[in-house]
Amino acid sequence: MPLTVLCIATYRKGDEFLRECRRAGCRVLLLTEEKLRDSDWPRDSIDAFYYVRRDMPEGDIRKGAAYLARSERLDRIVALDDFDVETAAMLREYLHVPGMGETTGRAFRDKLAMRTRARSAGIPCPDFVHVLNHAAIEEWTSRVARPWVLKPRSQAAAIGIRKIHSASELWEIIATLGDAQADYVLEQFLPGDVYHVDSLIFNRRIVFAVASIATMSVRSQRG
């Protein structure tokens, strides 16, 4: 029986994946933003569209997906963009669909989880601290050379990153964050080129990998 694949894309992308699902004989459902309703999607490869608002509460998305699952057998849930990884992981766990859940998904989106996982595996990374316990932050800033970089844990690329040159500047910024402080990680700034490797792994074997260099130098204010 053909698989039914629910694809999530809150940005306009993923055409080739959608077409490949169709070529593979899958039933393809697309969950996207209301504002993308009239976008030039590969409509001949999509069986049905469903729409959400960017500010829709997570609970409402869960309820909507559960309602959809009353009539659709959801075999797979696929995120087509970085910003959709967490939503897809949440829905997989809630609907008990195969694939990585929220804990595993955080290792791909949460900068704190990424660094913790890398350090525990012995992979070199800049010194860092979770913006959570103030005593731990004070201890960290007393021993780690400046400048530092304050990063949102779940944004993509350089969005929301701030370069900090003093403890007083840091605490002023932390105060403005209020209850959102724990959504950030603080790390030592190390100037240099930034590379990343995109890969596909199947049955624990790397079947595709490509290395890229960031177009924006980390020597910049936001890098």
Locations of regions flagged by a protein language model:
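ATP-binding N-terminal substructure of ATP-dependent carboxylate-amine bond-forming enzymes
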Residues: 1-104, 109, 135
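Generic structural signal for residues in well-ordered beta-strands
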Residues: 49, 128, 184-186
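Glycine-rich phosphate-binding loop signature in dinucleotide/nucleotide-binding domains
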Residues: 67-74, 142-144, 178-180
